[in-house]
Amino acid sequence: MERLQRLGGAIGAAANYLAKSCPPGIPQQPTARLQLMDSQIQVLTMAVDIIHQPLQDFERSLSDEQRAKLNGATPVKRALSARRDNTVIHSCGASTAAIDWSIGQIEKSVQLNEQQRPALSDVQQAFGKAATDLEAHCPTSVPRSAVARLETIESRLDATWRAILSIQVALQDFEGKLTDDQKYRFQSMTFAAE
């Protein structure tokens, strides 16, 4: 019972931490949005860290039968898990078309000269590498245990954080090569989620 209470307290603490860390809004500028994503990934990672050890302690304290119930060993839960597995697999695919579209929009809006094009190419490569790295950390199925699911989330958050950092570096370098007018056009762009 004590371990369950510790887990409940950790979940409550993580929820409060997340609630206090919610941004008041989403910035318009691409680099500012990436900075916000960076900070939110760090917040999510901290929340997962708060829960991890109490969850692990709780799971270890259970009998095999209790652990099976916690991990969803009922026919209904297995069916839901199979449906979720299918969703996980489909939601992780990298979209080169979306990357190419975004790069095309930047090129059209900003109107680059020949000396600036390599920096945009670096941005495109950073997006492509980030997509590949995220794909490599995409789970092929939902792990059975609660701790394993949490560890999968931790791994995915870490991969997302590294992807954001690589894109930030490329975007900052790209922005540094733009004229003031081009920077204004770039910062004024909006990108709809594809």
What would you call each of these model-derived segments?
Residues 1-194:
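Charge-rich (acidic/polar
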